Structure formats: C-alpha cells, structure tokens
Amino acid sequence: MSTFKSLSLSALLFIAFLFTCARGATFNIINNCPFTVWAAAVPGGGKRLDRGQNWIINPGAGTKGARVWPRTGCNFDGAGRGKCQTGDCNGLLQCQAFGQPPNTLAEYALNQFNNLDFFDISLVDGFNVAMEFSPTSGGCTRGIKCTADINGQCPNELRAPGGCNNPCTVFKTDQYCCNSGNCGLTNFSKFFKDRCPDAYSYPKDDQTSTFTCPAGTNYKVVFCP
C-alpha cells in the first residue's frame, strides 16, 4: 500500500510539473492612446479599443511566431469587414494573418528553449504606434518600450500614411531585407535603433533586441505608454 501511495504521489507531482511547464500566458493589451486603436493578434483575432480600454488574450503553451500589433484608421461593417490605414489584415476585424506594414510589432514565443518565453518589439515592419511590452508576473521585471516620435521624425523616403516604413518595405533589396542572411546595420536601420534601442531595427538585430522570461509569465502590451 505504501508503495502504491508513493507511486500515486509521484505521478501527481509529475502531472503538476508538466502542467506548470505547459502553462500558456495571459496578455493584457491596453490602449492609452488619445485615439482609437484596433488591436490585432495572431493568434487571437482583433478588437476595437477606445482610449483606456483593454483586451485579454490567452495564447496556449508552446505558441510561437506570434505577434500583437496596433491598427489605425480603421472602418469595419457589422460583419467585421473593412480596411485599416495601418496594420490591415486582409480587411478583417478578426485577424487571421499578419498585418500590412507599417505597424509596430510585439512578437513572442512561449515555452521554448530551456522553458523560457522569448519576446521583443520589432520595427522590421515599420512603426505606427508607440508601444510597451512588459512582463507582469513571475518575478521577471525587464520590460521594453519604443516611445520615440518616429512618425514625426521619419525620413522622407520611408514616410507612409499613418506611419513610418521599414526600408525593406520600400526598397525590397537584400541590403535591407536580409534575404541572404548576410546583412547589417544601415543608415535607415540606425535611425530606428537610435530612437528605440531595445527594438529590432532590421531582421538580424537579435543580440540587443530579444528578451526572455520564465515560461508561465504573464504580459502586457500597451499602446502609447
């Protein structure tokens, strides 16, 4: 009987361990902008957020290649079809695919190497709205922000209605898009990096732009922090 109890306890502890390791995350997406933002998430969909409103999503454990982004200048009909000036995702309120540049990105992958979450802010698709991406639990305290006036200071070559394009979107060359995997900092990517040093400014900008927290951490994404 004692052996059976010991095995049962071990099994329960193992199940609890697996549950802890496999836990997803809660993301609180908050709009602090003085204008309406149509938040988008893949996975997750989309939601209109007026000033001060928030939206909760709960991506599952192991989610990767995921992102949250703000859309601006949107109009949707009662069926959730329409168009956005920035960040549009095939004309849908409930996004099923990534948005069109320019849009500021909060990217993440949960429960990855060493059971860590990886997260970043990326300007590889350009910039439309200032953003904060921060952990809110788990003892992880290193948040990241991109709050510079990038739209106002955007180089003429990169200007777009409602935002500032990344040079890859405009020029579509290997120098800026890193299609061959061999690229580095350029004057245009330096423009973004100087203003938002924690954010990705070009596709290979990994060393200074990727951050980690223990799996099971919860997060907030704030527009106009």
UniProtKB/Swiss-Prot annotation:
It comes from the Eukaryota. N-glycosylated. InterPro entries: Osmotin/thaumatin-like_sf (IPR037176), Thaumatin (IPR001938), Thaumatin_CS (IPR017949). One of its GO terms (cellular component) is extracellular region. Keywords: Allergen, Antimicrobial, Disulfide bond, Fungicide, Glycoprotein, Pathogenesis-related protein, Plant defense, Secreted, Signal. Residues 1-24 form the signal peptide. Glycans are attached at residue 187. Woody stem plug. Disulfide bonds join 33-224, 74-84, 89-95, 140-213, 146-196, 154-164, 168-177, 178-183. One of its GO terms (biological process) is killing of cells of another organism. Has antifungal activity. Belongs to the thaumatin family. This is Thaumatin-like protein. The gene is tlp.
